Design a protein with these regions (language model features):
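Sec-dependent N-terminal signal peptides
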Residues: 4-14
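Sec/Tat signal peptide C-region and signal peptidase I cleavage site
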Residues: 15-20
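N-terminal "mature-domain start" segment
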Residues: 21-49
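Soluble non-cytosolic domains of exported or imported proteins
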Residues: 32, 69-74, 147-151
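Surface-exposed amphipathic alpha-helical segments
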Residues: 38-41, 136-164
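Short coil/turn motifs at secondary-structure junctions
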Residues: 44, 115-117, 142-144
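Conserved polar/disulfide-associated segments of primarily extracytoplasmic proteins
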Residues: 47-123, 128-129, 134-136
Length: 164
């Protein structure tokens, strides 16, 4: 597998989710970008972003905006803490770095293989520069359900665009 989000995003360029709502990142007042997330993913707004899960809980996606190195470090630490709390273990030796397009942005993905309560899992932490800030997209999937959700994930990732 070359890269998880790279393959997914390339496969579904230009496809738009019909039942999706557009969310501004980090929020409506200070938007630097937007992303569409399907209503079926029960999206939840959080400080500086949004997260949601597929209806079967096999896929988790979050996107947050940060404006400083300190913010990046804090968000990555929060992500690792969330994964640990959800009993996700990552195999550090599996780490791969990939470059791809996330919507209209250049992105750098760090992909890990690991395990969660349902068995083998993959986790991607993607850094996306936007204006003078950074979006951090976290993707966690139960490997057995990955193909089933490729289209929806591709739609979400490729819906990223800059706010005017």
């Amino acid at each position: 597998m070359k890269t998880l989000l790279t393959l997914i995003s390339l496969a579904f360029i230009g496809v738009i989710a019909v039942d999706a709502k557009t969310y501004k990142l980090p929020n409506d007042d200070f938007a630097i970008a937007s992303i569409d997330m399907p209503d079926s993913w029960k999206p939840k707004a959080v400080d500086n972003g949004i997260w949601g899960q597929s209806s079967d809980d096999a896929v988790y996606i979050s996107v947050v905006a940060v404006g400083s190195d300190k913010g990046v470090d804090a968000e990555i630490n929060d992500t690792i803490e969330m994964l640990n709390k959800n009993k996700v273990t990552l195999d550090d030796s599996s780490k791969k770095e990939n470059k791809f397009k996330a919507g209209e942005f250049d992105a750098t993905e760090y992909l890990f293989q690991g395990k969660d309560e349902d068995g083998p899992a993959a986790v991607s932490i993607t850094l996306i520069p936007v204006k003078n800030k950074l979006l951090i997209l976290t993707y966690w999937v139960t490997t057995a359900k990955e193909k089933e959700h490729q289209q929806e994930v591709g739609q979400i990732v490729n819906s990223l665009k800059a706010s005017s």
